[in-house]
C-alpha cells in the first residue's frame, strides 16, 4: 500500500508529493560522492564524552524520523528542495524498516536523547548507500559528530562487504562542502533521485 502525503509546495497549492511535476519543482543540482572502501585506512573518529553510537531498530523509528526530518527542515540550505527531500525520506524510512530489508540504521545519542542518525543501504547495486546521509540536529553541529557518523557509516558498509560506497546530495549542502570530501570522497554530477518509494 502506497501512502500519499499532502503538503504545501512552493507554488502554494496542496498536492501529493508523489505527483510532483516539473512546474512544482525547482531545479536542484545534485552531486554524487563515492568512496573506495577497500582503499580507505582503518576508520575511526573519537566522540566527545557522553556521546555514543548505537544501532537503531523499528522501536526507534518515530524518534529516528523526527531527528532526520528536523535536521533537514532546520537547515536552510535544503529550503529549495525540502518537499522532494520529505518525499524521499518517507520512502527511505519505509523501506529500511521493512522486515525483509537489510537496511542499517545508526543512532547518535547524547545521553538518552537521539541527536543524529544515518541510514545505510548495504546493497552493492544501490546508487545511494547513505540515505539520507549523516544527519545531526542543528544545535549539535560543528562538533565532529557528523564526521563520526560518516566514519561509522563507511565502516559499516565496508563490514557488510561493499568495496565502494556512494552518497547523493545537493551541491550546496553542508555535507557536500565540508563532510563528504573527507576520507577521499570523489564528487561527480548526480542524477535527480526518485521522489516516491
Which residues are covered by each model-predicted region?
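A short beta-loop-alpha structural element at the N-terminal edge
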Residues: 52-67
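Hydrophobic alpha-helical core bundles mediating ligand binding, dimerization, or RNAP-core interactions
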Residues: 64-72, 89, 157
